[in-house]
């Protein structure tokens, strides 16, 4: 199995660029402090890097 990353939305998307709000929704993050676990793939990392100022990313086994 591949690595997993836990992504938590720590800042609100209110007032952010529409593209950044859409990326948060694509990742499955709706409200502040919501978390999701995704596989650590280049595609997911690319989305995370776009909105890294809104997120907390933790690696898990």
UniProtKB/Swiss-Prot annotation:
Q: Which UniProt keywords apply?
A: Ribonucleoprotein, Ribosomal protein
CDD domains, per database record: Ribosomal_L30 (cd01658)
Provide a GO CC annotation, any one. cytosolic large ribosomal subunit
Keyword Ribosomal protein tagged = yes
Any GO MF annotation of the entry: structural constituent of ribosome
Gene Ontology BP terms = translation
Could you tell me which Pfam families the record lists for this protein?
Answer: Ribosomal_L30
Family, per entry:
Belongs to the universal ribosomal protein uL30 family.
Q: Which HAMAP family match?
A: Ribosomal_uL30_B
Subunit record text: Part of the 50S ribosomal subunit.
Q: Could you tell me what this protein is called? A: Large ribosomal subunit protein uL30
Origin species, per record, is Legionella pneumophila subsp. pneumophila (strain Philadelphia 1 / ATCC 33152 / DSM 7513)
């Amino acid at each position: 199995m591949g690595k997993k990353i836990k992504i938590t939305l720590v800042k609100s998307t209110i007032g952010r660029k529409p593209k950044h709000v859409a990326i948060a929704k694509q990742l499955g993050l709706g409200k502040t402090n919501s978390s999701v676990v995704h596989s650590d793939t280049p595609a997911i990392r690319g989305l995370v890097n776009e909105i890294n100022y809104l997120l907390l990313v933790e690696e898990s086994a």
